[in-house]
Amino acid sequence: METLNESIRNSSLLCVEAFHNFHCTYNDVSEAERAILIAIIIPAIAITIFGNLLTVVSILYFRQLQTRTNVLTLFLAVADLLVGLLIMPFSAMRSVYNCWFYGWTFCKIHSWFDYTLCTLSVLLLSCISFDRYVAISDPLRYHQRITNRTCALMLLFCWLCLPFYGLVFMLEWNLVGLEEELAQICPDDCPVLLNLPFAMANTIFGCVVPMILMTLAYGRIYQLARQQARKITSTAMGSNVDSARSSLRREHSATITMGIIVGVFISLWMPYFVVSTTESIFGYQASSLAWEFINWFTYINSTVNPILFAAFNRPFRNAFYLILSGRIFSSSYRGVDLFNVQHGSKVNQGAKRCVSTLIGKESDR
């Protein structure tokens, strides 16, 4: 019986010899257009790696950022960092040259980690939404409900997608029933094909259910935040007002940041889940160029997350500033109050301009 790999190798589609005996689908992208793609993709990869590395270092270094919420945020940044290191460079070569230079086995490994890391981001965002919901809805029992054990169990649950996608892609379960489509693929292409059962399961459990839960959680959080703000204003007196408002503002700052990140995530990922599901149902009609464009929408989500942290969360913004300015190397800033960091030193103006360039001119909240 012919294997799926042999089916691709015996493709009857007219392919072109692209580079050094690699046979790929014809690509009418001009050299000028290819240069533009490279000029866009390389900075995106660099920002993804640098920004998420900055997030990881910030959480590991500054004590104020070492909260249970940020344990989940740390793993989200690690997942995004791995997307920049392991996924985007190889996908960039495929996008620019419309060819896969690394063999069929590595194509499956690449798809495995691509889906694993992206699904991991979805699940981590869902866990962070639950954490924020508990912090706002039940603040007095937050530390009883969100314990170290709870965080460990949530992380374990999220990482279960690693062996799941490993079995699916390495055993080619996602390609069962797609022999006809595979026969039309060139030998050195790396197709991202999902049969209907896997596409539906991936969409429902990797998109629809988490996004519904996140939307409901943040909708409820918004209602509770407004109620708490009114209650504090009407019941607190004198210095108690400032203290209560300060505590509430810090919780809301983290919640607003994660809410924005979830909103951006849904916007960037929805096209992929819609197209992948409809393609599986009605047949694969979208061009390889369209697929690459949609895939890069999902990768860009890993690029923008650290930018959103810096733009909408003052502690993270100040942490990035202290790292880029080099102040963490001159004296101990591990215990600094990241809500109140002075930016006035002349030595640090270059770093301040660097941060401003990266995140734009955002006013402190």
From Swiss-Prot:
This is Trace amine-associated receptor 365. The gene is TAAR365. In addition to the well known disulfide bond common to G-protein coupled receptor 1 family, trace amine-associated receptors (TAARs) contain an unique disulfide bond (Cys-24-Cys-186) connecting the N-terminus to the extracellular Loop 2 (ECL2), which is required for agonist-induced receptor activation. Disulfide bonds join C24-C186, C107-C186. Keywords: Cell membrane, Disulfide bond, G-protein coupled receptor, Membrane, Receptor, Transducer, Transmembrane, Transmembrane helix. Its main location: membrane. Residues 1-35, 92-108, 172-195, 276-288 are extracellular. Belongs to the G-protein coupled receptor 1 family. One of its GO terms (biological process) is G protein-coupled receptor signaling pathway. It comes from the Eukaryota. GO terms for cellular component: plasma membrane. Changing W296G: Abolished activation following binding to spermine or putrescine. One of its GO terms (molecular function) is trace-amine receptor activity. Changing D114 to A/N: Abolished activation following binding to trace-amines. Olfactory receptor specific for trace amines, such as cadaverine, putrescine and spermine, but not by spermidine or triethylamine. Trace amine compounds are enriched in animal body fluids and act on trace amine-associated receptors (TAARs) to elicit both intraspecific and interspecific innate behaviors. Trace amine-binding causes a conformation change that triggers signaling via G(s)-class of G alpha proteins. Residues 57-70, 130-150, 217-254, 310-365 are cytoplasmic. It is a multi-pass membrane protein. Changing Y299F: Abolished activation following binding to cadaverine. Residues 175-187 are annotated as: Extracellular Loop 2 (ECL2). Specifically expressed in neurons of the olfactory epithelium.
